[in-house]
Design a protein with these regions (language model features):
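M16 family metallopeptidases and their MPP-like homologs
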Residues: 1-38, 51-53, 140-223, 231-278, ...
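Extended, domain-scale alpha-helical bundle/helix-rich regions
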Residues: 41-51, 57-60
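His/Glu-based metal-binding/catalytic segments typifying zinc-dependent metallopeptidases
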Residues: 3-26, 56-58, 72-167, 326-385, ...
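In a subset of proteins, long, contiguous C-terminal domains/tails are tracked
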Residues: 284, 497-558
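Short beta-strand/turn micro-motifs at beta-sheet edges
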Residues: 133-137, 187-191, 286-289, 345-349, ...
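Short alpha-helical segments and helix-capping/turn motifs at coil-helix boundaries
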Residues: 33-40, 130-133, 285, 502-507
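Non-catalytic, conformational "gating/processing" segments within enzyme and secreted inhibitor domains
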Residues: 49-50, 281-318, 516
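Glycine-centered hinge/linker elements that transmit conformational signals in sensory
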Residues: 314-329
């Protein structure tokens, strides 16, 4: 199981109260059974002693609590009610539930190639790639994780199809509840996620019934009845999700603007709302047929206790439900800002009292790993300084942090503050002061201190995964980019080892101080008029529409 500080702390706490051999099972360990005491408790469990709590927004009340004025009522249980409850003649016949079909009974391990330290391409065709490896760190566990992506080329950028796919996803989730619950009880999970240009299937857990779980999920997606009632529920969920996004706290709303810009293609919320109302069951049916029949590629990544033949068999099972034309692999697209020098400022009025400002700085011209290595190390250095300055010393806001971020293949630094007392204008003034002071601190940093920061980052990157999920995650970026060498992380580590203090200074000077690359500021302005002054950023373009903004940038393929 994945380790955590809370888990370790809990074990230490148990050691103070129980013998070492019982620190895990102590809630279930008993030395003797007191039958008399148990029977005495059971004898008290009668209708005469019962207390029933009913929570219902339609319940009739006649009292209020003293301090919070919460409405409530107290009623005695009538003799007629008791008699009705004790009449068992109308009770349905009780039956044991059907056996969970996903419980594992075979925990044997597959014979595997222990020398395979990264996923290996075990099958390749024009529109098919299958990568697999046994777990290097958890090879003694009968578990695996597998991801299967079906892509459709050429890709479309169509609002109706995008909304239809999202609604179909909600509808599918509604009918998959039983399978998902059974799988979770059996120590497994699986998902079918979709967009207008493809489907991703994922499953993890004990391997004995993993293929069956995936097959059941796929077949249910293929065959479930599309009804007006389910569509109405899906539309409600979609609208509720849009409503939640509009009611998020100030900083989340500010950050969401940059996230939406980086996620191509994006459609404005107002357009999504209008389209939701137009979608019919025919649109949903067309989308399902498209996803089931129009795939042009299948890409698979499996890590864990699955043999190569088992992985291939799962892929074959997928293609019995989702038709793969096996014609073209497309690894996806991204918004390219690498050469951009545009400065953007998005301002949004929100219904909260708080304000938030988040601003992201990106360099110009760095390749992906060169930029990522510098941004990662600078984040480790600046994040504590930023928090100590704006949060601890200046008490500017209760949410203050700096971190490295990425749009497409370009990495940069992002600074975020949410404040109940400062306007976006004041936050930006403190940012500018902090940036200048930090440049001086970076220049004055000793070689020894710089080496400590670098060693700390390398230790984190070289830390062994603590779960199969973490081990799988190490390969996801390379897999999604089509890098069959799976050496993205190894190259990043080598670059960080070679970084000098001057490399960091140059990156900071160009990115933050001189702002030679792309900059995106996002302000969420609350309704408190005393602190509603926006940051007027010289030379920045005002952004009115993220959807329109995306059209001004080149879209590239990985």
């Amino acid at each position: 199981t994945e380790k955590s500080g809370n888990y370790v702390a809990d074990l230490v706490s148990q050691m103070m109260s129980y013998p070492l051999e019982n620190i895990i099972d102590q809630p279930y360990a008993i030395e003797q059974m007191d039958t008399q005491a148990i029977n005495a408790k059971l004898a008290e469990m009668t209708l005469a002693n019962v207390r029933i709590l009913l929570v219902d927004d339609k319940a009739k009340t006649d009292k209020k609590t003293k301090y919070f004025e919460a409405p409530y009522a107290v009623h005695k249980i009538s003799e007629q009610q008791k008699a009705k409850w004790l009449n068992f003649s109308q009770n349905p016949e009780l039956k044991l539930p059907a056996l969970n079909p996903y419980f594992a009974t075979d925990f044997s391990l597959n014979e595997s190639d222990k020398s395979r330290l990264k996923p290996q391409l075990i099958e390749a065709e024009q529109g098919t790639q299958i990568y697999a490896m046994p777990s290097h760190y958890f090879g003694n566990e009968p578990k695996a994780k597998i991801s299967l992506g079906l892509g459709i080329t050429p890709k479309v950028e169509d609002l109706r199809q995008s909304v239809s796919a999202t609604l179909l996803g909600y509808m599918s989730d509604l009918v998959q509840n039983k399978i998902d619950f059974q799988a979770s009880i059996a120590g497994m999970s699986a998902s079918v996620s979709m967009a207008e240009n493809g489907v991703v299937l994922q499953a993890d857990g004990y391997t004995q019934n993993l293929a069956k779980l995936l097959k059941d999920k796929m077949v249910l997606f293929q065959q479930f009845t599309l009804s007006e009632d389910t569509l109405a529920q899906a539309k409600q969920r979609y609208l509720e999700a849009l409503d939640r996004a509009e009611k998020e706290n100030a900083l989340r709303q500010a950050n969401a603007v940059i996230t939406r810009f980086s996620s191509y293609p994006y459609f404005e919320m107002a357009k999504q709302r209008a389209m939701i109302e137009q979608i019919s069951l025919a649109d949903i049916q067309q989308m399902r047929e498209k996803l089931l029949n129009k795939a042009t590629s299948l890409r698979v990544l499996a890590v864990g206790n699955l043999s190569d033949n088992q992985v291939k068999q799962i892929a074959t099972e997928v293609e019995t439900v989702f038709n793969n034309q096996n014609s073209q692999i497309d690894l996806g697209r991204y918004l390219d800002i690498n050469q951009s020098q545009r400065k953007l400022n998005h301002i949004k009025q929100i219904s909260h009292e708080d304000n938030a400002l988040t601003i992201a700085y990106f360099p110009k011209g760095y390749d992906e790993l060169q930029g990522l290595s510098r941004a990662s190390l600078l984040k480790d250095i600046l994040s504590r300084w930023y928090f100590d300055d704006l949060r601890t010393d200046k008490q500017l806001g209760y949410v203050v942090y700096a971190y490295n971020t990425r749009i497409g293949t370009t990495s940069g630094l992002q600074f975020s503050v949410q404040s109940p007392t400062a306007s976006p204008k004041e936050i930006m003034q403190h940012n500018e002061r902090f940036f200048k002071e930090s440049l001086a601190k970076l220049n004055a940093m000793s070689t020894e201190e710089f080496e400590k920061y670098r060693a700390s980052l390398l230790e984190v990157l070289q830390h062994k995964p603590e779960s199969l999920d973490q081990e799988f995650a190490e390969f996801v970026t390379d897999f999604s980019r089509g890098n069959g060498q799976f050496d993205h992380k190894a190259k990043l580590i080598e670059l960080i080892k070679q970084l000098t203090k001057q490399d960091i200074l140059d990156f900071y000077q160009q990115t933050i101080i001189d702002q030679t690359g792309f900059v995106f500021a996002s302000q969420a302005v609350g309704k408190n008029p005393k602190i509603s002054q926006v940051a007027e950023l010289k030379g920045f373009e005002k952004v009115e529409s993220v959807e329109a903004l995306q059209k001004g940038f080149e879209i590239k393929r990985y």
